[in-house]
UniProtKB/Swiss-Prot annotation:
Coiled coil spans: none
The name this protein goes by in its record: Protein M1627_2099
Entry similarity comment: Belongs to the CinA family.
Highest taxon in the source lineage: Archaea
Disulphide connectivity of cysteines: none
Matching InterPro entries: CinA, CinA_Arc, MoaB/Mog-like_dom_sf, MoaB/Mog_dom
Length: 263
């Protein structure tokens, strides 16, 4: 398969402590996958400047095509993503006029004064661009560095989703000429362990992703959801998935499995 790697960095103590479920990473992962990227790693770091710098630097060193972060762009003392990204890139923070104008307009419309804490959200790494946030205040941060698209989004889910879409539609440079496709088989009466040798052989033969998801207890009434997925040229990946599906169906038949239309 062709791979256009992507990485996700989540910033927030609340995620590490378990207080907040990392739904942002799930959404970003699904969205990038739908574009043809292969998400290789999700990194979660605390609200600590050194940890944020390390998270970005390590991701950059692995040279993916795109890095998307969420969290840490707000006005409070523990919102440190802009500073961490700047240090990771070896540049200074600067007052970005576009970001400043975006923020000023939103507060002015509500007759709210622009305090230093609110102005903080307009400081971006040197060379970065502000990404419109139509659902909140803090703009996203976009910078193209060493052939990597880097985007920092707010942590509030609806704001993250909006900034991510604005980035994809207007700024993303590295767009894979690939299509992500997947298909599913639902089967009863076949244990995951019994199907495992067939899956292993097909993965090796076709260089494709096959994942069995057990939906019940294996030793009682086994039910499996089988996912077949891959990225590549659309027609090629369609043909490959169809071949894999047919061979899996043959294996399921040998194992006396019962095919279902859905779970």
């Amino acid at each position: 398969m062709d791979y256009w790697f992507a990485e996700i960095v989540t910033i927030g103590n609340e995620v590490l402590s378990g207080k907040t479920v990392n739904t942002n990473a799930s959404h970003i992962g699904r969205r990038l996958t739908s574009l043809g990227f292969t998400v290789r790693r999700i990194t979660v770091v605390m609200d600590d400047i050194d940890e944020i710098v390390s998270g970005f630097r390590e991701a950059i060193d692995r040279k993916p095509k795109v890095i998307v972060s969420s969290g840490g762009l707000g006005p409070t003392w523990d919102d440190k993503t802009a500073e961490g990204l700047a240090k990771a890139l070896g540049v200074n923070l600067e007052l970005n006029k576009t970001a400043f104008d975006m923020i000023l307009e939103k507060y002015t419309k509500r007759n709210i004064p622009l305090t230093e804490e609110r102005k903080k959200m307009a400081y971006l790494p040197y060379g970065a661009m502000a990404v419109e946030n139509n659902e909140g205040i803090a703009p996203g941060i976009y910078i193209y560095h060493n052939n990597i698209d880097i985007l920092a989004t707010p942590g509030v889910p609806r704001e993250m989703e909006n900034v991510l879409e604005n980035f994809i539609n207007k700024m993303l440079r590295n767009k894979p000429n690939l299509k992500y496709l997947e298909d599913f088989i639902y089967v009863e009466n076949v244990m995951e362990s019994a199907l495992a040798p067939y899956v292993k052989e097909l993965v090796k033969k076709y260089d494709i992703y096959i994942k069995t998801h057990p939906k019940s207890y294996e030793l009682l009434r086994p039910i499996l959801e089988i996912q077949i997925a891959g990225s590549g040229r659309e027609e090629e990946i369609k043909v490959k998935i169809e071949k894999v599906k047919n061979e899996l169906l043959d294996a399921i038949k040998k194992l006396n499995g019962i095919i279902r239309n859905s779970l």
